[in-house]
Amino acid sequence: VNEIAPRVHNSGHLTINAYNISQFENIPFDTLNEINKLKKVLPKPSVNRLIQHRLAEKDFINKLNIRTTRYVSIEKKSDIETLEDFLPGILKTTTMGYDGKGQFPIQKIEDVNSLNIDFSKGYILEKLVKLKKEISVIVTRFGVNSFEIYEPIENNHEEQILKQSKIPAEISEKILGQSLEWSKRIAEELKYIGTLCVE
């Protein structure tokens, strides 16, 4: 831990303007867990492990009665051959995917044969849906019943990579209210301490 995160030992002291802060969700769970033994990590390492796994993350969200696109776990190539009703869809690695990486658009069963997919990894197949737009809601939770929820942000992508975000998002009052309520529900259920972005 000392070699990986030398700043851990300084984190218990009040420090102003000393370090840059960056956002990256793919920090190994074991690394965060070791740091957590020395200095409390917030949000909890278990939260980071959950959001790093697309299948576990979607299972969690659906248990909160928040709808996602239809999805199914894929362990081997032959699994897809029985799932024609999920197509067109997007096959995604369950871990380490971001900015379009680890994603394979599949229009029909035959497409699987033409794609270079390593089935030794875990995958999730998501039913393709036509999105009108993507929004993000940022929630900062300090503790039980202590949080701030910020105005939704509208995101525009090019080739699956975020290019622009704008405020205010052009959304209905219904979508506004629902997005704020869902974001709060997720943060509360996770017992999240810190700042969370829900897309």
What are these regions (language model features)?
Residues 41-43, 69, 90, 124-126, ...:
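Structural detector of well-ordered beta-strand residues that form the stable sheet scaffold
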Residues 17-25, 29, 51, 55, ...:
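Electropositive phosphate-/nucleotide-binding environments in soluble metabolic enzymes
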Residues 1, 106-198:
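Internal nucleotide-binding/catalytic subdomain
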Residues 5-27, 37, 178-198:
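Active-site "cap" helix and flanking loop/linker of ATP-utilizing ligase/carboxylase catalytic domains
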Residues 16, 46-50, 69-73, 104, ...:
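Glycine- and other small-residue-rich loops at beta-strand/loop junctions that grip anionic moieties
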Residues 60-66, 92-100, 157-168:
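Acidic/polar active-site rim loop that often engages polyanionic ligands
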Residues 28-85, 96-97:
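Conserved N-proximal alpha/beta basic substrate-recognition cap immediately N-terminal to
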